[in-house]
């Protein structure tokens, strides 16, 4: 109750403050494109007739020729759809050949009939784990050459050219902005976080609502993770891994030390390099290389030079990942949708993903803001035993609370993004408005019944969470105290 009163008082104070200059807080170390800061807000076209779609957001027009996009859950005889059975195309494929047109004018508004600024043949499917069960589908898009014979890198909505994209449709997140906001803030402080752009989507001419075009976690010669590309002469290579539910491509699935030694029930798969570079020998080398890191992390020498964990892992990356996911109580991190990568010439780093359920937006149970949790997850279990790591977390948290994680900055960011989206929010809920009456979170009192209430709820959570962490961040020291870790030390 104490922190709720503090949060309410802070919210009231923020309403009295003038708009925060967001750009003053943004860093030069990791320059980041924030769409809502760079693109003008909506002003009606002179010829706008009130019926034709006219928007300042990019338009993504997907044409499947009337064919259904595969990947939709199939209910069984008892109408149970959580059975890992999904639709395919008529020929049994998990991907559908289609086309995409993008209308994204640098100035002025966009309309479906405008000349496209980008066109491409694509393969498309419904994507997501729990999110694929939502009525509003998210999609995986692979861009192809005109004949469909090979992948094609395209600069989608101004992002680095690549051939794979996640088109995220906010559904459970009634603010519509969680992924956009937290990916961008992560990109300000970490070496890489997926770039994102709001857009509005039409599927076969039918309006689908507000979406977020998102970079998938991968690497190109000069894109995304920007890892050193594989050499033909050696099995040693840069790689990116995902801790989740595994891949449908068996050569990408690997078993590492934490799985067989710690009985970790999640699967690890290789998301980079792509299949054309990934021989069984290289997959085996990656599994062994990463297992060697995990073994060193779980050894008696985990915090002792020259074998200490930070000799192989970038401490600042692991610290920032911990703080962002703890601050937002994004507790899929560390066991689902968890990405870790290493350049063949460098150290392990973390990459954020999926804040759709962050800030107390899990279907159940309630995410109370008065606790820490990541210290129990696989790699952070050992990192949290190291005083250097815990001290770095505490110092970095206090630094970020003076800027990007301050109450003023976070609330102003939410307000500015929401204001910039403008009528696109109303258009989205003209299709998905029933979700505002639908109780998707449990217990029922957690469900906001308007977009404004959803944004206010996220503000309240961030302020309450920040107030609690400000007062209690030092309790993390208990996990690195000698009395708790005698058996792990020399």
Model-derived regions, located:
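Middle-to-C-terminal accessory/interaction subdomains
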Residues: 68-70, 134, 268-334, 342-490
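Phosphate-handling architecture centered on phosphoinositide signaling
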Residues: 2-313, 435, 445, 452-484
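Short glycine-rich loop/turn motifs
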Residues: 138, 335-337
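Conserved protein-kinase catalytic-loop segment immediately C-terminal to the catalytic Asp
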Residues: 202, 337-342
